[in-house]
Amino acid sequence: MARPEPKATGRAADFNLRIAPTMVELAPQVVISTIAYNNKVPGPLMRMREGQPVTVEVVNDTDVPEYVHWHGLLVPSEVDGAQEEGTPAVPPHGRRRYQFVAKPAGSRWYHSHTAAMMDLRRGSYTGQFGFLMIDSANDPGTYDQEVFLALREWEPYLTTTDQDEQAADPNDPTPEKPATPDPRPNGLEVSAPLYSINDKMLGAGEPLRVQSGQRILMHLLNASASQIHRIVFSGHRFQVIALDGNPVPAPQPVEIIEIAPGERVDAIVEMNQPGVWILGELRDVARRSGMGIVVEYANQQQRAQWLPPKKSRWDYTIFGKTAPHPAPDQTIDMVFEKVPGGPHGINHWLVNGKEYPHEREFVFRQGGRYRLVFHNRSDDSHPLHMHRHLFELVELNGKPTAGIKKDTVIVPAFGRATVDMVADQPGLTLFHCHIQQHMDFGFMALFRYA
């Protein structure tokens, strides 16, 4: 029997989202079932002006409550889309309106913020994500084409194989590495057999068609629930101009972009190598399983080429500047540790010795300047996300920098990062690892304003 349509109220919304089951054809004879917005993966591009009041009407056509998180936006707790902050759910077969002012300008995104736990058909394991662009007068310069590329994997499953996708370099600093390794065996982790950029596996969709001499503005988003990816555009370089939607002080050309769940990278690419090329994952197994797209110059018909990069290192700090940081009002040390789950269990995570949920909260005073020091005492890399605020990177593994503003930062295995932030968004504020399994099993904390 058909359910009644939930009733809308008030004026027409600026944007409408419908959460519902859908089928996605990743490639011929490769069709997967997921949950998505408006039967599309990614969901519809939301484009708005900075400072614009926005109303988004969300209809939930599933049997479970849902939350839509406006990632990277400076919005009140009650609309941020996190249950832990007190945002109301979009009820099953009901609707909810999110109303906020669009800020700050830049590449943002929206996605499910529902806990999945052991159900790999919920939360960020699904196709519930989309790009959100907030335009301002400060544009990235002239470009001929704008492209949105979301990185995804599909059909997740639990495995005993270590899924930390950031290949450790033996020369990397490990300031947080313990003298004695933990002898306990790891628990089950999440892997996936299928990969795509947007909704197509490599070679299955239309190529990205370009012309020699064009400047292409690429918006890259890692919409994965579990994996860090390293992206290469064969024969070309990325001129990185923004991280997490925020312009960098020193744009730089790089051969590889390392991007963790939740992160965005904006880059200009000069089309100066006519041919047919592959833009895709550095790791052969991920690229051959679908993570890539063909880029085809006009009047070029040959087989797509893949060329590995000469340099494969990624370093946030090259995009920063040298400048002193104002002294913080308070320094908060945050120590992250893993409790291994064993071969048939799940790893659990501690923040300062506590697994979420717990009674301990970190406290901000409005207007205060805080220095957060992230100590990663685990053998996994973690993309750490602060809701409703931006922070500035101060140092990474002892390498200083300034001017790089983000909302999500990778802290490497046994590594350390320091960020500065101003407490200027009153209300409960969620902090967590953006790997869904880590978040679900303890890697979260709440900040509240005094």
Model regions: which residues?
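Short, conserved beta-strand segments of beta-strand-rich sandwich/propeller modules, principally
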Residues: T55, R97, S107-W109, L217, ...
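Asparagine-centered strand-capping/turn motif at beta-strand->loop junctions
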Residues: V58-T62, L220-S224, F374-S378
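Short, hydrophobic/aromatic beta-strand segments
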Residues: P28-V30, V64-H71, H111, Q227-S234, ...
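Extracytoplasmic/lumenal soluble domains of exported proteins with redox or metal-associated functions
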Residues: A2-Y110, T114-D119, S124-Y125, G130-F131, ...
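Acidic-aromatic/histidine active-site loop/patch
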Residues: Q145-Q214, L221-S224, V339, H344-K354
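N-terminal edge beta-strand
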Residues: V24-E50, A192-G213, V339-Y370
